[in-house]
Amino acid sequence: LTGGSSRVTIVVHTHPDGDAVGSGTAMLGYLTDIKRKNAALIVPDSVPDSISFITKGFEPGSVIVFEDERLKAEEWINSCDLIICLDCNSFSRTADMETLLRKSTARKVLIDHHLNPETASFDLTFSKEGISSASELLFWILMETPEIEGDASRLPARCAASLLTGMTTDTNNFSNSVFPSTFEMASRLIEAGVDRDAILVSLYNNYRENRLRLMGFLMSGKLTITPCGVAFIILDKETQDRFDFKRGESEGFVNMPLSVAEVRMSIFLTQEDDIFKVSIRSKKGVSANDCAARYFNG
């Protein structure tokens, strides 16, 4: 599909996280550096400051924020002949971009690791649940391409760094959803020259002071642990205003209550206007997916 395309649009889910931005920029790097395609990554809304470093090193204008540059994004979607959707199982997760994407006559490819992929909307689907991240799934797909032939050192440097960054964020630095293939991916990329230490510094040692103070406030005053071992934290608008909260700064907070022996599941709710964004993590033997499907329509 990429071989027969001249103008490619890459899209990811709304409120993009590290895996979305990592896999999206990795695909962008592969298409532009290896396939010499005219390509752009379109994110529905802004990339959080905490992971914006992932987009550094990519050409100006190649990463488009739909809510900020709507006309430019619409032109890209309407004129492209291939759409690649990464890290989301349906166009419904692309917010205001959904209608444009569905109406497009371009061929469509899905690359994702979530449950229930909307395969009917795509010409080609790569879907695997037993894998750490969309970034890892994309890595193994790229390893099978004739340009790479299983040699990670042939990947463009910025593509390889994005892949390792995306996987690292989605596994919480190898804490969740890690498989033997995940370690093999990391090993190959590091052997190929990716600077993992630099990635970790950018991800985990580059926050604002307010984030640390917010974390302490939430854990001391907003954390509730039920008798059945479910922990939940609500980050309401008042607290967000108090600490000048920036989107993305609560990344990883949902994992913290799991350090308590009695906690089997952790739920983190973030107020956004008239809705709450929900993140769920659980320990082995307890299904976060089942909880999301039953109570949170996800």
List the model feature ranges, each with a label:
Residues 64-121:
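Active-site cofactor/cluster-binding pocket
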Residues 1-15, 22-57, 62, 68, ...:
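Hydrophobic helix-and-loop "lid/oligomerization" segment in the mid-to-C-terminal part
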Residues 41, 108-110, 125-127, 230-232:
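Conserved beta-strand scaffold positions in the cores of enzyme catalytic domains, especially
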Residues 18-24, 91-95:
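Short glycine/serine/threonine-rich phosphate/pyrophosphate-binding segments
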Residues 113-187:
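Short alpha-helices
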Residues 17-19, 87, 112, 170:
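Acidic active-site catalytic centers that drive phospho-/nucleotidyl reactions
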Residues 57-58, 104, 120-122, 295:
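Short, structured coil segments at secondary-structure junctions
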Residues 27-28, 100-103, 126-127, 185:
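Glycine-rich, phosphate-binding/catalytic loops in enzymes
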